[in-house]
Amino acid sequence: MWSLLLCGLSIALPLSVTADGCKDIFMKNEILSASQPFAFNCTFPPITSGEVSVTWYKNSSKIPVSKIIQSRIHQDETWILFLPMEWGDSGVYQCVIKGRDSCHRIHVNLTVFEKHWCDTSIGGLPNLSDEYKQILHLGKDDSLTCHLHFPKSCVLGPIKWYKDCNEIKGERFTVLETRLLVSNVSAEDRGNYACQAILTHSGKQYEVLNGITVSITERAGYGGSVPKIIYPKNHSIEVQLGTTLIVDCNVTDTKDNTNLRCWRVNNTLVDDYYDESKRIREGVETHVSFREHNLYTVNITFLEVKMEDYGLPFMCHAGVSTAYIILQLPAPDFRAYLIGGLIALVAVAVSVVYIYNIFKIDIVLWYRSAFHSTETIVDGKLYDAYVLYPKPHKESQRHAVDALVLNILPEVLERQCGYKLFIFGRDEFPGQAVANVIDENVKLCRRLIVIVVPESLGFGLLKNLSEEQIAVYSALIQDGMKVILIELEKIEDYTVMPESIQYIKQKHGAIRWHGDFTEQSQCMKTKFWKTVRYHMPPRRCRPFPPVQLLQHTPCYRTAGPELGSRRKKCTLTTG
C-alpha cells in the first residue's frame, strides 16, 4: 500500500447507507503519476478482520473489476492493481466489503497526470508516482522510508536511492530493506530524494520510482509525540523447538513521523546479526492509514527455532519506544503425559488380561511344574479327588463311564500326574456301611470329580442317603470343596438333572470329554486333561517310569474315632 503515503488527501465521508444497503466508510484521494504500477489494498480494521468478501468496481459500474492476472487492471485478493497506470484510469473506484450480516464501501478517487522528478533532458529516470514529504532531525541518526506496498504476486527487487537525481553513496547512508538510514543528519541532507525498484509480475518487469521531499528540523519530534508499540508487550512466547514462528510488531504513530521501526537482537539489527544463516529475518513494513495516525506492522520470522534462541530478548524498536519478546520452551504437559500413561497402562492391562484368559491354563500349569514342590501336602487329606460317577442303564454308556473312570482317569491323573484318587467301587472297604464310607472318604479329599451323562436317572444311588447326595452335600455344604463337573456327552437340558448337579453346573461350569478312549486321549497334554489338571490341586507332575498298569487290591481299614487310629493293609501286584 505504498500509495497510501503519497501526497493525497483523505476526505472522510459521513457514514451513510446507500440504496443497496452498503454503508459508505470514507473516500481516499490519490494523485498519481502515469506509467507506473499502483496498488491499493481494501482494508479497514476491524471490518475486514473477519470472514468477508471484497469486490472492486470502477465508478458506478455494476461490473466488477476483472480478476484475470493478465489484465492490466485487475483485482488481486483484496487489492486493486494497475500495471501500469494510464491517463484514462482517473476516476472513482469502489471497494465493497460484504460480511455475513454487513456491507461497507470505500471510495478511492484517482487522479493521474504526467509529472517528472528530474529535468526531462537528463532522461534515464522514469516518471515519479508522486512526492512525499519526510523530515530528518538535525544531528541525529534518522531514516527515510520508501513506501512500496504491493500484493504478494508482485516481487520487488533491491531499492536504489537518489538525491537530486544522483545515486546516493557514502558511509553515512545505509540501505535497509525499504529504508535509507542516515547517520548524523546535517543541513545538507535536505533536498529531493527518490527511491527506485524493479517490480516483477507474471514475468513482466516495471519500474517504480517514488519522489520524497526532505526537510531538516532541530525538533526532537512532532509535538512530543512518541510512537506506541501495541504488540509485543515485553512478554514470553512458548514455542516448540524446530518450528517456524512469525511475530508482528504493531506500532501506532503520527502520519508525519520519520521514526525507524525495526527488530534488534543484542543491540544489532536482526538482518545483520543473522546475515550468514538468514535463519531469522525482518519482514517488509506495512501500514494502514487512519484519520489521525498510522498503524505500522513489521514482523520477524524465525524459519527454524533453535535452542540458542531461547531466553534471548528480541527487541522491537519504534523511535524511542521499545518492546521485546523472549522465546521459551513450552512447559511439559503433564496432563497429556498422564492421560497417555493411563491409556498405555489400560491397554497393557487389557492385553495382559486378554492373553491370560487365552493362555491361563497353560500359564498356571507351567508355573506349577516349575515352582511347586513334589512333596506331599500336609493338610490332613489323603486323596486329591473323590470320583463320583453314575451307573447308566445303557450298556454303551456304562462301558464308556467305566473306561473313563477305572482306566483313563487313573492312567492320566495318578500315573502321569501323581495325583491320588478315591474311586467308589475301587477303593471302598467291603462290609462297611456305604453312607459312612462315603462320608468319611469325601472328607479326606481335596476335590470332588462328578461325571454326568445325558441319562439323568443314570445315578443308581439317588434315593435317600445315596452316594451322590452324601458326596455333593459334604462338598458343597460342609467342606466348601471345589467340584469338577465332567460331561461324558453333551447335555442339552440340565433341568432334568438333580438340583445338586444343576447347582454345580451353574457355579463351577462343566468340562466336556472329547476323547475316544484311545492312547492319544490318555496324554495329559491334551486340552481336556490340561483343563482338568488346572482345576485339580497344585502338584508338580513327574512322569512315572513306563510300567504295566497295577492291579489294585482293596485296602482293609479299621474305622476308629481318630484318623490316626486307622490301619490299612494294601497288597499291590503287577498284572
From Swiss-Prot:
The keyword RNA-binding does not apply. It catalyses: NAD(+) + H2O = ADP-D-ribose + nicotinamide + H(+). Keywords: Disulfide bond, Glycoprotein, Hydrolase, Immunity, Immunoglobulin domain, Inflammatory response, Innate immunity, Membrane, NAD, Receptor, Repeat, Signal, Transmembrane, Transmembrane helix. Disulfide bonds join 42-95, 146-195, 249-316. Residues 1-19 form the signal peptide. GO terms for biological process: cell surface receptor signaling pathway; cellular defense response; inflammatory response; innate immune response; positive regulation of interleukin-6 production; positive regulation of T cell differentiation; regulation of inflammatory response; signal transduction. Residues 20-335 are extracellular. Residues 381-536 form the TIR domain. Expressed in synovial fibroblasts and articular chondrocytes. Expressed in keratinocytes and monocyte-derived dendritic cells. Expressed in monocytes and myeloid dendritic cells; at protein level. Receptor for interleukin-36 (IL36A, IL36B and IL36G). After binding to interleukin-36 associates with the coreceptor IL1RAP to form the interleukin-36 receptor complex which mediates interleukin-36-dependent activation of NF-kappa-B, MAPK and other pathways. The IL-36 signaling system is thought to be present in epithelial barriers and to take part in local inflammatory response; it is similar to the IL-1 system. Seems to be involved in skin inflammatory response by induction of the IL-23/IL-17/IL-22 pathway. Interacts with IL1RAP; the association is enhanced by IL36B indicative for an functional signaling complex and inhibited by IL36RN. This is Interleukin-1 receptor-like 2. The gene is IL1RL2.
